[in-house]
Amino acid sequence: EVAEDSGFRTIAAKGTELARPELGHSVHVEVAGLKPNRPYYYRFTAGGERSLRGRARTLPLPGTRTDALKFGVCGCQHYESGFYGAYRHLAREELAFVYHYGDFIYE
């Protein structure tokens, strides 16, 4: 589900996907028809369990002037070295995007 508000009262998009082996047993979702340059909230449900709420922002319209933007950068992490504390800091920021240059997890 993708919503316009953090309480998911106004759903902008929703759908169903399968985690496929050819995509690394993960779900790849492309959402169309969202309004430009605004925040949206998303969540996933699988097997009766619901994810925590995530936040994303759509791009401005092409040609729109942007004076500055803030982005996060992260790389490889290791569960035993701190339970992914850097992501907590990234989530608190109003970022335009996050560039992740390495593996998501080592187990």
Language-model segments: which ranges?
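Divalent metal-dependent phosphoesterase catalytic cores across multiple superfamilies
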Residues: 1-107
